[in-house]
A protein has these predicted regions:
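Conserved AdoMet
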Residues: 30-106
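Non-catalytic accessory regions of SAM-dependent methyltransferases
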Residues: 1-47
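Conserved Class I SAM-dependent methyltransferase catalytic core
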Residues: 84, 216-278
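Conserved SAM/SAH cofactor-binding pocket of Class I
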Residues: 97-198, 224
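Mobile active-site "lid"/loop adjacent to the S-adenosyl-L-methionine
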Residues: 190-220
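Residue-level signal for inorganic ion chemistry
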Residues: 27, 66, 96, 127, ...
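Conserved hydrophobic residues forming the short capping helix/wall of the S-adenosyl-L-methionine
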Residues: 14, 107, 159, 229, ...
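A general structural signal for well-ordered alpha-helical segments in protein cores
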Residues: 7, 24-25, 55-56, 69, ...
Length: 281
């Protein structure tokens, strides 16, 4: 069976179960670890029997267990870079790319020549690694922390694979962090436990709950970071968060209560998603 035939057969299987047919192509491309261009030029190439068997095993796993693509193949792409994904870290989200974009936009406009950056709740390390690779015209020192040793091991592996020099620290937020930072960035757990029933099984069953849910209606980590950030921000330092679509007012309130001026930006779906907080001395 060649690649095109395998994809057509997989599409039929997915269609019968009312699944997204585009998964058929992307799953085979990811499994073979090829770029879109490489893959498109080899559609008539025969699959090895081992490849064919593995491919349809993965297709059936998605159908029967609703396993996400990234967990089927063990990696995902973020900002055009490849990152290892396991059950111990979140799969990369498109919304987080928008957080990266806003941070890069801020850095580009800044008159500073160097930045010391702290990435709290780093998970797989995608934020820290992407910033290290994308900021090329200014010097950066990046520290990334997480409370999960398993997540940190994945982040370290991802940094090595992407040739990104980052300091990783096991820490519950600021507990083991020292020094001042020009930027504090975080995409912390922010889903309220009461919203758990609204979350898709493909997320609940495969993403770590430690990285998804937070107390205080999802605000706990934002509150802890905002209340303590002044001790870790350098002069004119800034905080960037990814936030839940319904958390804007709570972030504004937390910012105001701790002398921060808050700006919230919408994502591509016109939902409140990125918060920027500047300390109002």
């Amino acid at each position: 069976m060649n690649r095109r035939q395998a994809i057509l057969k997989a599409c039929l299987l997915l269609r019968r179960q009312d699944k997204e047919e585009s998964l058929a192509k992307f799953l085979l491309m990811y499994m073979l670890d090829e770029t879109t261009e490489q893959f498109s030029n080899k559609l008539s190439e025969e699959l090895l029997i081992e490849q064919e068997n593995r491919y349809f095993d993965l297709i059936n796993k998605n159908i029967n267990e609703d396993t996400p693509l990234s967990h089927l193949v063990g990696f995902d792409y973020f900002y055009d870079r490849k990152f290892k994904v396991t059950k111990d870290v979140l799969s990369p989200r498109m919304e987080t790319e928008e957080l990266i974009y806003k941070v890069l936009e801020y850095i580009k406009k800044s008159k500073k020549d160097s930045f010391r950056i702290l990435d709290l709740c780093t998970g797989s390390g995608i934020i820290a690694i992407t910033l290290k690779k994308e900021i090329v015209k200014k010097y950066t020192e990046i520290v990334a922390s997480d409370i999960s040793e398993k997540a940190l091991s994945i982040a370290i592996e991802n940094a090595d694979n992407n040739n990104a020099n980052i300091t990783f620290i096991k820490s519950d937020l600021f507990d083991n962090i020292s020094g001042k930072f020009d930027l504090i960035i975080s995409n912390p757990p922010y889903i309220s436990y009461k919203d758990k029933i609204t979350i898709k099984d493909s997320v609940l069953n495969y993403d770590p709950h430690l990285a998804l849910f937070a107390e205080e209606d999802g605000i706990y980590f934002y509150r802890k970071i905002i209340e303590n950030a002044v001790h870790y921000l350098s002069k004119d330092g800034v905080i960037f968060f990814e936030i839940g679509y319904d958390q804007k007012e709570k972030i504004f309130e937390l910012g105001k209560n701790n002398n921060f001026i808050t700006t919230v930006y919408k994502d591509i779906n016109d939902r409140d998603r990125i918060a920027k907080l500047i300390y109002d001395k």
